[in-house]
Amino acid sequence: MNLILLLVIGFLVFIGTYMILSINLIRIVIGISIYTHAGNLIIMSMGTYGSSRSEPLITGGNQLFVDPLLQAIVLTAIVIGFGMTAFLLVLVYRTYKVTKEDEIEGLRGEDDAK
């Protein structure tokens, strides 16, 4: 299970990097969003799923236990990532409406084009 999760995280980081290195602004926003999903998976993988610890209040059981603090952190990170993605999409939309450009090369001024 951990190997599959590691491969998924690596694939998400690879795809996010590929998208961020693009010149299209929408792809850059999608790449940043994919990075946040990879970060959430990294945080979730730090949980103690599969260890021999049991729940803190039940003393007679031998059931598996997942740390709820990491789940709360990931839930908060999902909300923050959603807000950041929404803000970046509005920023790209407004930039497109003002400049009629959706690529980074077109946003450079006349002085920067040299």
From Swiss-Prot:
CC annotations in GO: plasma membrane
Molecular function, one GO term: antiporter activity
Membrane-topology descriptor: Multi-pass membrane protein
GO BP: any one term: monoatomic ion transport
Any Pfam family hit: Oxidored_q2
Record's function text: Expression of the mnh2 operon in E.coli is not able to catalyze Na(+)Li(+)/H(+) antiport. It does however confer higher growth rates than the control strain at up to pH 9.5. The operon may encode an NADH-ubiquinone oxidoreductase.
Family assignment from sequence similarity: Belongs to the CPA3 antiporters (TC 2.A.63) subunit C family.
NCBIfam families to which the protein is assigned, alphabetical: PRK12660.1
Official protein name in the record: Putative antiporter subunit mnhC2
Provenance organism: Staphylococcus aureus
